[in-house]
A protein has these predicted regions:
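Nucleotide and nucleotide-moiety/phosphate-recognizing core
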Residues: 1-154, 160-200
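SAM-dependent methyltransferases
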Residues: 1-3, 207-212
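PAPS-dependent sulfotransferase catalytic core
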Residues: 203
Length: 212
């Protein structure tokens, strides 16, 4: 089973309004992402911050349009950032791994989704990699130094065994997502326009980003 977690529980302070429902090219951002996921995954867990937003997104999304099951869930704790959203989603999935995506990246394409899961499957065929915790894209640089700083943690695949670790991080007021990559069995895959288009990682955070 291929699972995906879509993080829609952010406060959107820089944008000034809920991002996932904002229209770009005549469609809500979240619809662009769901179309990229279609025929690529089996289930999608959408993490939101309250019942009102769940009702709002249920009006935007109709289950019959997609090949995968859609589940809506409320973030375990509001305003703790994407790290808490990842934990919430991992607790709901019916598989061991999930691709985590943000709701403000409308240029995610199906090739990226396919590549991530295909790479994961190839890795897991090797018994030596059964303990893999995360599959993380990163931007290349000379000598590939400081990979963690150039990684894309919100476009990555995580194992649900992260749940107790994330809970511990949050209990200690550690909220940065990049902490998931430290001292863990993570595999980094380089972002290359021939395999992974860099547009997949473009976030729309401010009104001016949409106007560009």
């Amino acid at each position: 089973m291929k699972s995906c977690i879509l993080l829609c529980g952010g406060m959107s302070r820089r944008m000034g309004r809920d991002k996932g429902s904002m229209k770009i090219h005549n469609k809500p951002m979240i619809i662009h992402i769901l179309e990229a996921l279609n025929n690529q995954i089996d289930e999608l867990v959408i993490v939101l911050n309250d019942d009102n937003r769940i009702r709002k997104y249920k009006k935007i999304i109709t289950q019959k349009n997609y090949s995968f099951k859609i589940y809506f869930t409320i973030d375990i704790e509001n305003d703790l950032g994407p790290l808490c959203g990842i934990m919430t989603g991992l607790e709901k999935i019916n598989s061991d791994y999930a691709l985590v995506l943000p709701c403000d990246s409308p240029y995610i394409d199906s090739d990226f989704v396919y590549y991530m899961f295909d790479t994961l499957e190839s890795i897991l065929e090797n018994e030596d990699n059964e303990s893999l915790m995360a599959l993380v894209p990163y931007h290349r640089s000379p000598n590939d130094v400081d990979i963690i700083k150039r990684a894309e943690p919100l476009h990555s695949i995580y194992h649900k065994s992260y749940i107790p670790l994330i809970d511990e991080f949050l209990q200690n007021n550690i909220r940065k997502v990049r902490v998931l990559m430290k001292n863990q069995n993570c595999l980094y895959i380089p972002i290359d326009n021939h395999l992974i288009n860099v547009n997949n990682f473009k976030n729309l955070n401010r009104p001016t980003d949409i106007e560009e």
